[in-house]
Amino acid sequence: MLRWLSLGLALLPSLLLSQDKIESLQQVQLLSQDECVIVQINAEWNMSANIDLSKLKNCAIFNASIDEPNYGVIIATEWKVKSVPTIIMFEYGKEIRRFEAGLSFKLDKDTILKQINNQIDDIQLRKFR
């Protein structure tokens, strides 16, 4: 499985992307070496449940769809996505926080944004310790 995943990732475009759309797992891994990265994973049929993360500061924000034919299955498998939307936070290449929708296929926007902002603040504070 890992060999297949590595081969699949090698064939995907790694850095050619629109500003907020994930094209490969390698892209997130490269970006997250230096900064906080947040990836919101959803499905085309559930996009109305996306949370607007564009106002968050000090963190790169990306969206990914499990329906994307080139990489959707790889993302869902590699990141063990069980429901959509799922928001995953990375710091220096490691997952530090995950928010997953329940049976409603929605996340509580206010609670999630508060928790994400608190996590970003913690990341920023750690830079000065």
Residue ranges, per PLM feature:
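Positively charged n-region of N-terminal signal peptides that target proteins for export
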Residues: 1-4
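Hydrophobic h-region of N-terminal signal peptides that target proteins for export
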Residues: 9-18
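Short gly/ser/thr-rich secondary-structure transition/capping motifs
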Residues: 19-23, 66-69
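Local sequence-structure signature of Cys/Sec-based thiol-disulfide redox active-site neighborhoods
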Residues: 21-62
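Active-site-proximal beta-strand/loop segments in catalytic clefts of secreted hydrolases
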Residues: 41-44, 66-67, 102
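N-terminal post-signal-peptidase region of extra-cytosolic proteins
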Residues: 69-75
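Structural micro-motif
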Residues: 78-90
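Non-catalytic, surface beta->alpha helical segment in thiol-disulfide oxidoreductase systems
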Residues: 89-129
